[in-house]
A protein has these predicted regions:
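Inter-Walker segment of RecA-like/P-loop motor cores
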Residues: 27-66
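Conserved RecA-like helicase motor-core motifs
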Residues: 18-20, 41-52, 206, 210-226
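Conserved interdomain linker/interface between the two RecA-like ATPase lobes of SF2 helicase motors
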Residues: 117-193
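Conserved segment of the helicase C-terminal RecA-like domain
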Residues: 270, 277-303
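Post-DEXD/H (motif II) to motif III coupling segment of the RecA-like Helicase ATP-binding lobe
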Residues: 77-137
């Protein structure tokens, strides 16, 4: 609600107030529309919410000073050439960049777009101040050796990971932990995401969970009717989504209570994006359980 409150204060008494909210995909756009409808309904007609791709195609249709307030969600994308052109075309009174992952893989800095940070809040500080849910992290160790898995400069090579990590014993270990420690009491009521390596891994994890009487569904680019699957998840008909690629960035479901990090990564950006999916705090959710699957990394370091 920080942005909504700031927009409300900024717009007070300004008849010419107009705001633009930019986001990378339609899922995040839908979330913003819901938030604006709920919290800023009187200003709804003066706030445009657009995807990056739409803005790239149409930004020149507005004058440079048309918007007085611009929000760039998932702002670590802002240094991409086309999006950067859009942002620098406009001359708002106030420009806000929102990101939990200001460290980009290509090392480009967001100060190029937004200037020096006015406010910077570490994840640890945010948890201590109650801005986000506290993460209760549990590490489960495997005997899988990743020391021979190649590194492409940003992260592990997926083809190598598949050979090393798609091991039945490792998958069963994850299922057993969920069955032994997360099926009773408050923990047993929580829904979760299992971050997998690839599409085949999502299917294997879902099959094993269902066999253990824990309702699960694979969720990837191969999923038929993904909107229906997501709706069933939000209606609590599915307890775990076994996902790859589709919900690392921007996806929001405040009730999410368990994150299983089943995909090894050396990317701090990806790791924080995945952790961030469960950090939305609600009136009844104060913490999120993070199950970190720790393999043998050899000389490599974890994010």
């Amino acid at each position: 609600r920080i942005v909504e409150e700031d927009i409300q204060k900024f717009a007070a008494g300004k008849e010419q107030f107009r705001a633009l909210i930019l986001a990378p995909n339609t899922n995040i756009i839908a979330d913003w529309k819901e938030r604006i409808d709920k919290d800023l309904q009187p200003l709804q007609n003066r706030i445009d919410i657009k995807t990056y791709s739409y803005a790239v195609r149409h930004y020149h249709e507005k004058t440079r000073d048309y918007y007085s307030y611009i929000v760039v969600d998932e702002a670590h994308h802002a240094v991409a050439p086309m999006l950067k052109r859009v942002i620098q075309y406009y001359a708002p009174e106030f420009l806000v960049g929102l990101t939990a992952t200001d460290q980009r893989p290509d090392k480009k800095r967001l100060e190029e777009i937004f200037g020096n940070y006015t406010t910077e809040l570490s994840l640890k500080d945010a948890m201590e101040k109650g801005v986000v849910a506290r993460a209760n992290v549990y590490r489960i160790k495997t005997n899988i050796d990743l020391s021979h898995v190649r590194f492409n400069g940003k992260d592990y090579v997926n083809a190598d990971l598949e050979k090393s990590v798609r091991v039945t014993s490792r998958n069963e270990l994850i299922v057993n932990v969920l069955k032994d420690y997360f099926t009773e009491g408050d923990a047993g009521k929580r829904q979760g995401i299992i971050f997998c390596i690839n599409k085949a891994h999502t299917k294997e994890m879902a099959r094993l969970l269902n066999a253990a009487d824990i309702s699960a569904q694979d969720y990837s680019g191969d999923t038929k009717h993904p909107e229906k699957v997501m709706q069933e998840f939000k209606e609590h008909k599915i307890r775990f989504l076994c996902a790859c690629d589709m919900i690392s960035e921007g996806w929001d479901y405040p009730e999410l209570g368990i994150l299983v990090m089943a995909r090894p990564t050396l990317s701090k950006v990806l790791y924080l994006q995945q952790i961030g999916r469960g950090l939305r705090r609600t009136s009844i959710k104060k913490n999120v359980f993070v199950i970190d699957v720790v393999d043998e990394y050899g000389a490599m370091v974890r994010p």
